[in-house]
Amino acid sequence: MDFFDLDIEIKQERLPAECSLNSPLNISLSSQLTDRMTPQNENIRRQRERIRTHTKTHSRIKHLSKLDNDSTRLHARLTEDLIKLQHLEVDSPVFDNWALLTSYYAALDYTLPERASFDWGQAAPYWNLYTQLRTILLQSQKIRKKDRGVREIYSCGPLRLEFVEGTVLYFTDKQSGGEFTKSGELPSITPYADFLAWVKIISQRAQAVLMAVILRVTDKGLSPLPESLLSVYQTVDDILKRAGQPAIDLLKLWEPLVITKLGELLGDRFGLEEDFRLTIRGEATRLAKKLAITNGLNRLMTVLDSQTEAQPLFQFFGLFKHFAYPRVFSRDTIQAIQEVSDRPSSISAAEFLHDQCEIRKEFYIRYLKAYHRAPGLDLSALSPSSFLRESLEHGKIPNEKSPHYSNKEWYFIKFTKSIEWPISDTLSTFLSDKAITRDRAAWIEEGHSGRDMSEKRLLLKFIKENFSSVAEIVAAADAIYNNEGDRLIALKVKEMELKIKGRGFGLMTFMPRLLQVLRESIAKKTSKLFPEITMTSSDLDMKKRKFMLSKRSDDRRGFIHINKSLDINKFCTSQRQFNSSAVFSSLDEMMGTFPLFSRVHEIFEKTWIVDGSASDPPDLSHFTRILEECRLHGIEAPHVWADGVFSGLKGGIEGLCQYVWTICLLLRVERVMQKTKLTHYILAQGDNVIITIIVPVEIHRDGIISDQESRRLLTLSRNIDLSLESELEKSGLTLKIEETLTSENISIYGKDLHCPQHLTLALKKAASAAIISSEQYQDIPTFLSGLGTSLESLSECVNSKTGAHLFGVLMGVAGWKDLATHQTWRGWRYPYHKAPLSGRVRASDMKIGKGEAVELTIPVMSPRQQGKETLRELLANSLLGSALGMLAFPTPIDLEKRGVGDYITHRLAIARKALLSEKLDPHIEKRVRSACNLPLSSRVDLSKLFDSPFSLNLATEEDATAVIKRQAKKTLRLQEIGNDKLRAQIGNMDKGIAALDADLAGAETINPRLNHMIRDITDEKESEMFVTKFASARTMRTLAMGDSSEVPIVVLLEKKSQQKELYTIWRARRPHATMWKCSTVLAKGLRDISWGKTIVGVTSPSPIEAMETTHIDPTDWEDSRSRETLSINYYLSRAGIDEQTAKLTRGSLVPYYGTQTKPLIAKAYLELKGNPRTNKALLLLSVRESLVKTGSNLDELIMQLCSHALDIDAASLPALRAQEEATAGEGLRGGIKESMSPVGPDNFYTNITHKVFNRKWVTPYHVNIADFIIQGLIETRKHLILNEKMDGLLPLSSVKCTACFRKKEREFFDIPEGPTWKNDSTTSDPAYTYFTTWCDLPRVSTLPTMDQQSATRLLGRGLSLNRPTAGEIITKFYSMSMESQRLLHPVDLLLGYGEGVVFGYIRSQHIHHGALFQTKRETLTNKLRKFILDTKTQHAKQIGYLFQDEDSLHELMAQGLCPYVPRSIPLTITELTNACAITTIRATEVILSAGSRVALMPVQAIDETDVDNSRLAANTMQTILGDSRPMNPVYLDCDLTTNMTAWESSIELDVLKSENFHIDGLLMDLTARELPISDTPWKQRDWTCSNDPRIIAKGIKTKSLFIHQGVAEALNMTPDLLVVIGGGLGGCAVPYLQEWADVPLIFATLFDERERISEDGDLVVPPEILVRGMAPRMIERELLEAELCDVTNDGNRRLLTRLVKKNRGKGTVVLIDEIENRGAPESLLQSSLQDLVRRLDKVCTLTSIHTVRESTVEQFAQRTNSIKRDRKTVTLHWNRYNRRDQFEALVIVKGEETRSDYHVSTATAAQAFRKIDEQLEVEGRLSATRWSLPTLPAREKEILFGYVSSVFLKTNLVLSADDMDRETLLETIEDTAPGLISWKEKLEHRDHAFRSDIDEKGITQDKVFNLICLAWVITGLRYGIWETDAQSIITKTVYITRGPKLCPLGEKPKRVFASFKLQSDKRVEDAKGFLSALLHLEGFFPLGRQ
């Protein structure tokens, strides 16, 4: 039986496209293969030749046309003959093991009828034939090594089969008699797909008959007699044998015929008109006469007419759904049926008009409700006095009862475009929706995914090139509809598989596709008008919603729900009547898109639709030719219109314009429902409409519903059916009878009361077990795998589930065993594999000799023993779930849909029951027991074992308590009730429901399946009962295995047990006591008071407090009245005791609603989740959360917090993200994941399925709620056994702070709701600032109240202590909204950060050495330096944010904050790193030298003294930093500043004019030569900025502040206007403003550019200069807006030009262009700039100054030419701050120069730079004089110090102000440089070391490079000789001598301690940068102190 033993998985090859089962091509294909038609393509021709060779060799047939290829007749004949030859015993091992099966069912309390009571003989022939054919299929697909020339022939009785070249040959032996084929041995041939279709038909018949046989015994009256089925099949074969292919048309009328008969039985329940029956029967008779098979039809009708019961007759539906051709009636039949049922023509003109008007009215009303304003209307056609006009002009809904109202007037109203849809938006929907391609080749080839990005890009390109707006595309609609070439639409099987919306969409020609998507995406814009439509929901969601709807008001008494699910026949086809046009035209009017929607009908009339599974791309001329050829061969339409082409209106093309069709349908249904005046909900999705109606019913006090009411209900339901039908008929829609009839269910209290599932077609479902939808390729695995799900749905149809299960077991043993257990398939192949593929697979056990023809006979009977094993395995699995799992067990319907957790419990309970019954076969028992123990081992995930077959998971967000409550009420129904009063109540309810059921059952022969599930049993106020069914894993395992000590709880769950107890929970009201409030609640209160104001709070919440619990001792809880104790108001007692007695003999306490709160983190998370405004706050939250969850670097306090307060292992605290995943239910089927373990106390999980199985409880009390209750019950039970009185002692935890209780807990404790606070503030949103920053977010630990400064420092400190995974926190920090940080002062944060670094270092030392070494200041400083350098990059980024909020400018200014905010991250990593490192090292030095005590990190909580210490440290730092409030933190480029202090306001604006800064530049003229443009080679630039983290910055970026010095003088003019573009905030403007004091300024920072180069950081001007100094001179404020500053935007350039013209037209204007233009998008920028300059040139005399920096001289020349503006001469301005490692200079283009067409050549530029170099050499070589600093103002000195230290910082050396003198500098470098190498730990506290002690691993090339640079500096400082050849410098070796000390470069010491050399010379550029930076400095002022 086991076919699954191959060890290689083979990829299933797809069949030839022609073999799709539903393809009309099979006939045309076989005609082409047998020479009856010319092959359409090369492949088929070759295939034909190969078949011909085969038949010549083996059958001596030369002419293929002699082969019989009529598969219809052949298969009918074969079926007849083979059935006669079969045994009359069903061949299945199940029957030999009937006893085993009987005992299995007995174990589950089912009785299996005797084997003899089933008439298996009737099922045997089909069953056995099917088994043989299936075996042949399996054998033929098994991979084995094939030798050439060996034939594989399969036999089935006398029939022989051979698979050849994609076809099947059928023949018989000479010996065997019986004419199987026309002439003895002459073979017949059919395509493989036809053979599969035949096997499928046999399989379905076998299953249908088998099911009928079983149901005959288990569910009497449910199914037809097997005899009548067999006679139907026999007649059908006979008909097919006689008439062949055309008879299929007749069989398609089978269902309408069944309907006519049903209509007779059920009266007009179907709403069938008499003439419909006559037409159908007449049509059938006519067809039969035409085909000469009248007798056959009569025999069929006799069988039909003999059926007199509705139920069995119902099963005749769908008997022939499996024919392998499209289910399309012939044209005549369609017309005949349409004339009767679709009758749009029968509607009178008045009715039609009324209809159109109703639709317009509906649109109007919906618009009004959705948008609260009337749509735009054109009322001109209405008379001015019209009543309707008057209402509409006032935007009202007209009163229809008014005598003046006339519905007809709506016809004259036109909508004017009312719904806005921006072009870009529509196009984006359009693009994301579909991939659209013009490439027809892609239609057929495999591998084109529907969502191919490149296709979308092509489309976008196409639109951009051809259309400027959506309107244009719409306008093109006319042409498209009328274009001959666009008339083809193709369907491609693959597309359907991908579920791309609109079945016809896939291969539609290009332009109609464009329209189609455009139409859909525009229609979606109306979604606000049609909330009922859910196009995106899957079937699953639809089911969910339906389920939820029926529960929506389950607690309201006296309401009954009626659910109907409408299914409509040929949905889109039928709607293409003119009636729906009103909807389309209304949409067109509202959208302003005529004729996009209105013409939709036409496209169908004019379209040819081609089956895309055909082998050739559709093509009209080719198509017509083939069509002719087909007609000649007598192949009739519509089956094979050539390549499967059919016309648009003839069905098939579903789904186009789906959304609008849905609107049409919805409006009709809504119209019917409104007339009922009942509460109703509608969900619509295409042709699926679900309607839920809520009907009030009168229920008597004794629970009985009167006859009158039940009759009213039935009439109501039927009337709705009828009116729906007549309304839908107006659109030509017919309801699908079977589906609609069987969908209606009536429920009360959310439970099904009347479910017509018994009408569902059991046989049809059984037979469809093997149905394959046409999209799947026909391989055996797909062929078989349909079984599991079909059986599952089958079990819903059958009342006695034993029948369905028995059927499943039979099928399973027949070969689905593997599917039932593993659900994997291996080693199958398509019979026509390519040889090499088969060759790779090892040979199977069959050896075939060369050249001999071997016939493989397959034994009909299989070995019995093997069958028994299979059966056992199947049954064991079926107990524990998986594919056949659920079938035999009566699972309550809502449990089925509940999800894994309940499902597992349910299975285990069933398994346990079976095990305890002792009736199970021991082998099965053994298997089940071993499986049940699985959860104890970690090897197998429990949920893998219980893989629920229900994909439907309606896990609504309920907590454990709700689940328990729900389950309890269910279980309660099964208890023996002791309380008389209660028992009487329940009895009453039962009586009422039974009466209702009886009434419903009166509906003819329909017997409803009853469900006694009642929601609310007793009055809640009096008492509440519950029993729990769900518990922890421990309890669950107890359920499964009977040997645990905790059995008592299981007893409660057993149905048949005698020892049940019932407990009552009493509730007593307590007097209210004032309770304690935790800091979180106080902080919230504070927040509420200060809402809308910028008050900074004084408390900060503490999670420890919020999670603090009190333990309550039950012995005295009721008497204790003290303030701290909480009262628990529930306790248990035995049933039937009055309250007073219960108090005296009370049982254990049960906190029914669970009294732990969620931990704060989770609480804040849930509060914030989903609110877009507060979502950002979550990011901040997670920063803080990570403080709690880091491990190593935190103190004991946090560890304890995690272990005790949160009841989890700190190391495994999951991120909130995991929690979110869990809530979303991801990974549910994959198993219950570890990540789902709850955050905080266990009641936090939101869904029962997130249970974590192997839990270690921290305390015996801290368990989840279910366990609480169970424990209460178990304790109570123990007490009852030991004592008579119940005095339980179950202590429990409760949260201290009552204000933290949730709503349910408040109810529980009788605590009234506090007054809720409403925000009546008018400000936009400042309150959230405060909320998101401080309130509801936990702090690291409990601190005394702090002012805001200290609090901020704490955060900074936290950041420095927390080492996040690379970039994690950083990213979150940056993506936070700025408003949440608006009140944090950066300086505070930095101070906190500095302090944290010190603390962190000291603590790490403490951890390493067990004690802190008290060393002298120097060594500690050095170590700190190292520590800071190690950690700086990790943390630098976290501080680098600025403030950004235009609205709060004034508020910020008032607080002393700088208003400027760039859009990108403002400072580079390097800069921040430098700033932080310098700041913290300075601060640390001061703290240590001041000798103030720095405490070690505290082990327990932080106390007052620690806080004082940290404040002291911070204040000390403040004095160093000169932080006097208020201050303006302005970030200069950090390369320029020692720390992040601001420019003091007191600085004079003219400081920068001091001598030192007055730098004269060198001016060079560049003259253009006669070098025509074409000769200039345009060099492609690479990305040269230092953004790449792998490149060390190429030296120091020179600052525009210095570069522009002296230019204003050189220009020798005073302009009328200054325009600045680029340059950050334009430091470049400062030198000019100093020179020209009163020139007005236009300031346009190029933000776009800034974002691109932000890694380099730009200069930010002091706010005084900007705000105070420049503001008066600003011309137009709006130019500061980021959007206007982007000159790549044409509008901005125009604006700039206009402003210049307006203010200083014809004057002289200076333009400073500071744009670094060397990146990827340079062409755009360059052309924009050229354009801008050209425009400005026309309106004024323009002098432009451009910063140009390029890496090669060619690029420099190129760039100069691009900005030269046709000037003959441009001037180069160069000064010492320009870089020398690249070609950098200012290019000045003067306004008044003459023009020329020539360009500056590369040679000219090179010469200019050479001159500059020569001049420099002459001006002064770098001398070796003493180090000295010129006298500078202190401020500038600091700037320059900063510059020096930042140069050194690039080599990882931190310098302080003390090091700025020559000797100190030398000493520092010599001593600290070796520290860059990581020596081993033992060297840390020694001052000497050995060479062998160097830890080689720590030495990277970077460090060696840094050493070389520093050694070079030592040489320069010591000897005054500065070598400038970088190439030779980096090749030298650098030595370290004993000490260790660094030696000058080029010197080798006597005792070499270590030496290093660079491995590669790639560092030349870096070295040049470093050297030039220091040389510039040295040239400017000698390093060191005077």
Curated annotation (Swiss-Prot):
Q: Name one GO molecular function term.
A: RNA-directed RNA polymerase activity
Q: What is its main location?
A: virion
Give a yes or no for keyword Lipid biosynthesis in this entry. no
Subcellular localization? Virion; Host cytoplasm
Give the Enzyme Commission number: 2.7.7.48, 3.6.1.-, 2.7.7.88, 2.1.1.375
Provide the alphabetized UniProt keywords.
Answer: ATP-binding, Host cytoplasm, Hydrolase, Methyltransferase, mRNA capping, mRNA processing, Multifunctional enzyme, Nucleotide-binding, Nucleotidyltransferase, RNA-directed RNA polymerase, S-adenosyl-L-methionine, Transferase, Viral RNA replication, Virion
| Cellular compartments per GO CC | host cell cytoplasm; virion component
Cite the Mononegavirus-type SAM-dependent 2'-O-MTase domain residue spans from the record. 1592-1788
Record field: catalytic activity = RNA(n) + a ribonucleoside 5'-triphosphate = RNA(n+1) + diphosphate; a 5'-end (5'-triphosphoguanosine)-adenylyl-adenylyl-cytidylyl-adenosine in mRNA + 2 S-adenosyl-L-methionine = a 5'-end (N(7)-methyl 5'-triphosphoguanosine)-(2'-O-methyladenylyl)-adenylyl-cytidylyl-adenosine in mRNA + 2 S-adenosyl-L-homocysteine + H(+); a 5'-end (5'-triphosphoguanosine)-adenylyl-adenylyl-cytidylyl-adenosine in mRNA + S-adenosyl-L-methionine = a 5'-end (5'-triphosphoguanosine)-(2'-O-methyladenylyl)-adenylyl-cytidylyl-adenosine in mRNA + S-adenosyl-L-homocysteine + H(+); a 5'-end triphospho-adenylyl-adenylyl-cytidylyl-adenosine in mRNA + GDP + H(+) = a 5'-end (5'-triphosphoguanosine)-adenylyl-adenylyl-cytidylyl-adenosine in mRNA + diphosphate
Domain (RdRp catalytic) spans 560-757
Sorted alphabetically, which Pfam families does this protein's record hold?
Answer: Mononeg_mRNAcap (PF14318), Mononeg_RNA_pol (PF00946)
Please give the InterPro entries that the UniProt record associates with this protein: Mononeg_mRNAcap, Mononeg_RNA_pol_cat, Mononega_L_MeTrfase
Question: According to its UniProt record, which protein family does this protein belong to?
Answer: Belongs to the rhabdoviridae protein L family.
Function summary: RNA-directed RNA polymerase that catalyzes the transcription of viral mRNAs, their capping and polyadenylation. The template is composed of the viral RNA tightly encapsidated by the nucleoprotein (N). The viral polymerase binds to the genomic RNA at the 3' leader promoter, and transcribes subsequently all viral mRNAs with a decreasing efficiency. The first gene is the most transcribed, and the last the least transcribed. The viral phosphoprotein acts as a processivity factor. Capping is concomitant with initiation of mRNA transcription.
Quaternary structure annotation from Swiss-Prot or TrEMBL: May form homodimer. Interacts with the P protein.
What name does the UniProt record give this protein? RNA-directed RNA polymerase L
